[in-house]
Amino acid sequence: MPLYESVLIARNDVSQAQVETLVETIETLLKDNGGSIQKREFWGLRSLAYRIKKNRKGHYVLLGLDCTPDTLRELERQLGLNEDVLRVLTLRVDEIDENPSSVLARKSDDRGDRGNFRGGSKPAGRFESGRGGPRRSSEDREEYRARGEQDDARETAGAE
């Protein structure tokens, strides 16, 4: 039988338990028709890129399916009739990867606790250092002028 990966998005106001019940319903439908679920990942409640049926968030679920095309067609028809399911995307794959998907790997990467650090190296206040950074004293200006004059003298000596 061909292998498929299917991602479905359930509505925001559906609980995690109801999403798991939905997946069990899918598994029952597949088993009745000789198929099976080989992989199951709950990605959790995530923001949608755009509104879908007046929802801004949804519960994402990735399923690795082993079933016939007719069973898949019936599964997608049933999910289309279910009001709790916003979207379904199913792709045929050569093999189902047993490792966690990249979405779960990114979610659990080792960022750790940041404490109170909010990022950036700038001081807390916007005008703390004044406009244009710290002011240079007249002594600093003289030093820069002296360097410039030394560079000019070197260039002149090198040209001769």
From Swiss-Prot:
Entry GO terms, CC: cytosolic small ribosomal subunit
InterPro entries attached to this UniProt entry: Ribosomal_bS6, Ribosomal_bS6_sf, Ribosomal_S6_plastid/chlpt, Transl_elong_EF1B/ribsomal_bS6
Biological process (GO), any one: translation
Keyword Ribosomal protein: yes
Keyword presence, Cell membrane: no
Basic and acidic residues compositional bias, start-end: 106-116, 136-160
Highest taxon of the lineage: Bacteria
Molecular functions per Gene Ontology: small ribosomal subunit rRNA binding; structural constituent of ribosome
Annotated keywords: Ribonucleoprotein, Ribosomal protein, RNA-binding, rRNA-binding
CDD domains per record: bS6
Region of interest: Disordered: 100-160
Role this protein plays: Binds together with bS18 to 16S ribosomal RNA.
Family under the similarity heading: Belongs to the bacterial ribosomal protein bS6 family.
Name of protein: Small ribosomal subunit protein bS6
Organism of this sequence: Gluconobacter oxydans (strain 621H)
